[in-house]
Amino acid sequence: MIRIDELLRAYRRGYFPMSDPEDEKVYWCQPYKRAVFCLDSYRPSRDVLRLTRKKEFTVTLDKEFAGVIKGCAAPRKNDHETWISDEIIEAYTKLHSLGIAHSFESWYQGELVGGLYGIALGGAFFGESMFSRRSYASRIAFDHLVFHLREKGYLLLDAQIMNPHLQRLGAVEIEHEEYMRQLAHALQKKIVFL
């Protein structure tokens, strides 16, 4: 099992865990380039704004953490492997019970159709994963996360490793040294997530 104190210490040092889908062993990752979101310059897409105005989705915070992390761990259309092992689910569920890990959930007609989860430390939020069972469900949840972080005064939204989906949402890559500088600054802030 991943020890909670070890997990939190790793985040403060710029590491995050990933499980190997073949052996489920947990590895500590610290990529040379880090994907982050500039909270001040984030702008939702027109489609997200349209769906938000239409109130097609209902978004909640910390209502269904277990459903979100299991949705993130489930196989996807183009990728049947997952880095989210049972050990990782157990650790983040414990962090959630301690008020450190949080989820945003997107609901459509009463059904959980998307969401994301991550952990909050100081003025940093570490986005772990997102999932969507209906078009735009994870983007709507992400939009709510960004506005929540802005409202609370967060400085850093860490998305870890760049991928095409994060790039479409507006993530940028920064060098390791710059990431560590931003992380150190963000961790000095005292912010209550809820």
Curated annotation (Swiss-Prot):
It is found in: Cytoplasm. Keywords: Acyltransferase, Cytoplasm, Transferase. It catalyses: N-terminal L-lysyl-[protein] + L-leucyl-tRNA(Leu) = N-terminal L-leucyl-L-lysyl-[protein] + tRNA(Leu) + H(+); N-terminal L-arginyl-[protein] + L-leucyl-tRNA(Leu) = N-terminal L-leucyl-L-arginyl-[protein] + tRNA(Leu) + H(+); L-phenylalanyl-tRNA(Phe) + an N-terminal L-alpha-aminoacyl-[protein] = an N-terminal L-phenylalanyl-L-alpha-aminoacyl-[protein] + tRNA(Phe). Disulfide bonds: none annotated. InterPro entries: Acyl_CoA_acyltransferase (IPR016181), Leu/Phe-tRNA_Trfase (IPR004616), Leu/Phe-tRNA_Trfase_C (IPR042203). One of its GO terms (cellular component) is cytoplasm. Pfam families: Leu_Phe_trans (PF03588). GO terms for biological process: protein catabolic process. GO terms for molecular function: leucyl-tRNA--protein transferase activity. NCBIfam families: aat (TIGR00667). Belongs to the L/F-transferase family. This is Leucyl/phenylalanyl-tRNA--protein transferase. The gene is aat.
